[in-house]
Amino acid sequence: MINQIIQSPRLTRVCESIVNAVFPRSCVGCGLNRKDGGDYLCGLCRDDIFVIGDPLCETCGIPADIDYDYPAEGFECGWCRKGGFRFDRARSLGLYDSVLKELIHFYKYRNQPGAINEIEPYLRDYFETCREEYQGYSVASVPLHVKKLKERGFDQSFVLAHKISEILDLPLLTRPIRRIRETLPQARKNRTERFQNVRKAFDVVDAEAVLEKNILLIDDVFTTGSTVNEVTRMLKQARAGCVQVFTLARA
């Protein structure tokens, strides 16, 4: 009887439907078969993720323009030379290009928190080279507004922060910051509008948890840096120590 149930074509179709709902048949990056790849990307797209390396701005981590006359060491972009950010340093895993962009969109908007596992090997390789720089830090994430959290079903930055805290073996601060104001979408706003849009959108709700603590602040994408900059402002207002930022992608 049990063998008949296991071999049932109907049960097989149901199982296949469940698997396909969780893991897409085609590659999220290119739409082709996921041959030689993982659960979300094919082998070629996994290899095509562009991991950011030197030369880059020492403060915000933006890759240096190859046509720019930058020094071998100590390069700072124009914005950072003006003292444009409140965080101490920011780094991103890769460029927000076609593959990483599609994977992040799938991760965020298709309720697929498991997609972060596709990037885990890159995260481990990245932090293996700079683990000492984050020793003594506590990990925190840029929070979603409660309304957006209910719509999405999970907080993508918190999931990422949890993964990074495991990789670095660092304590994870659970919700020391909250988003107290729902903000308009940033996509079509210029730099000035983005900074204004997130002004006073966050609050530190557990000041003791961040007091004199060095914080590794996690978010998914760094575009202008307005969001992580505003969260940093609130953390430092609550007397946090050094604040370093890490995002999956740099747009």
Which residue stretches match the model-derived regions?
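Glycine-rich phosphate/pyrophosphate-handling loop used in enzymes and phosphotransfer proteins
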Residues: M1-D219, T223-A251
